Regions:
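Membrane-interface extramembranous regions
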Residues: 1-130
Length: 130
């Protein structure tokens, strides 16, 4: 892995984990305002019990991405982040929400893809052709 790729990986991963942690904690404690918070979920038409589920999954995903071992669990975490952000983007588009509401999920989706693509070899799954 080149130094450039390592820098890209860590910058994307740090910003991704900060974003997922902050929104995840906000969802767990059911903040009224903010990205993915109570007012946002009500606006999108989702039940509030999803806040706790999504918040806990985000925190678990952050832990999986940051720990150095368990590449299969990392892959699941990255795919979960992609599913969450694609779902968030679609939800905002489906209700004809203000385009500025797409920025947060789009940024986290891009950071997820960058972190996944530039992850070090030791954090990838070894694939064996049969």
């Amino acid at each position: 892995m080149t130094k450039r790729n390592k820098i890209i990986y860590w910058i994307a991963t740090i910003w991704l984990t900060l974003g997922m942690t902050s929104t995840g904690v906000g969802q767990i404690i059911e903040m009224k305002e903010g990205s993915g918070a109570v007012n946002s979920m009500v606006h999108l038409g989702y039940p509030l019990y999803l806040l706790t589920i999504i918040g806990v999954l985000k925190i678990l995903g952050v832990i999986a991405v940051l720990i150095p071992k368990y590449p299969l669990i990392k892959e699941w975490a990255y795919s979960g982040f992609v599913f969450l952000m694609v779902g968030a983007l679609y939800s905002h588009v489906a209700i004809n929400d203000n385009p500025k509401e797409l920025f947060g999920p789009a940024l986290l989706l891009i950071l997820t893809l960058l972190s996944w693509y530039f992850r070090p070899v030791e954090r990838k799954i070894n694939v064996v052709n049969l």
